[in-house]
């Protein structure tokens, strides 16, 4: 999981990229599934705060996230993310870590961009982090990775005052599973991340100075 919470002037965004992975006996990626959640927050000069009502992930939104119409490939987000996941399959975590991207987070590799032109830097980093945290929990050869990324509804009536800032916290729950050819769950792990943006009385939105870690990463 890679989470960023940042603000600029009166606009802020929380972005969480997540990956579920299966590693084979040689430590190479046997399966990868990706998802991403983006939540935009804005502030007004009066201190009022606007938060999104739709808190679904990109994969969950499906055609409601209309990337295909704007894509030169005519592919939606899930199609491109799955292409990237397939591109990573068979590689080691170290090989994934070395995948180069440009200043916009996009790859220049011809094989990859033939089916995926979206920025992949956060997904690459999420896969690397997932590999670093991977544990033997019961998955077997041939099992597939699945991923669920769910955010709780955000408050719709927040406002900052001269005496008190407004805090927008996203409670994001993640579950990574492996399933066998019969659709049975063979392993599972859950996690949670709680990134937060702060809105001041003049509407300025700011993010935390420190990196955002999940509950599992924070440990005890």
Where are these regions (language model features)?
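Active-site- and interface-proximal helix/loop "cap" or "latch" segments in soluble metabolic
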Residues: 2-220
């Amino acid at each position: 999981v890679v989470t960023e919470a940042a603000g600029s002037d009166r606009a802020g965004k929380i972005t969480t990229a997540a990956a579920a992975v299966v590693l084979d006996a040689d430590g190479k990626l046997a399966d990868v599934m990706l998802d991403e959640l983006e939540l935009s927050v804005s502030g007004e000069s009066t201190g009022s705060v606007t938060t999104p009502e739709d808190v679904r992930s990109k994969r969950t939104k499906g055609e409601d996230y209309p990337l295909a119409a704007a894509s030169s490939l005519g592919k939606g987000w899930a199609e491109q993310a799955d292409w990237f996941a397939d591109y990573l399959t068979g590689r080691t975590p170290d090989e994934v870590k070395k995948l180069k991207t440009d200043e916009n987070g996009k790859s220049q590799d011809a094989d990859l961009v033939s089916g995926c032109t979206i920025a992949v830097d956060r997904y690459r980093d999420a896969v690397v982090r997932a590999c670093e945290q991977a544990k033997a929990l019961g998955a077997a050869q041939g099992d597939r990775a699945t991923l669920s990324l769910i955010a709780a509804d955000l408050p719709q009536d927040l406002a900052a005052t001269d005496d008190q800032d407004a805090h927008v916290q996203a409670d994001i729950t993640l579950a990574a599973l492996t399933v066998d050819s019969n659709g049975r769950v063979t392993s599972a792990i859950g996690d949670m991340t709680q990134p937060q943006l702060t809105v001041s009385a003049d509407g300025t939105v700011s993010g935390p100075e420190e990196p955002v870690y999940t509950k599992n990463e924070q440990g005890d």
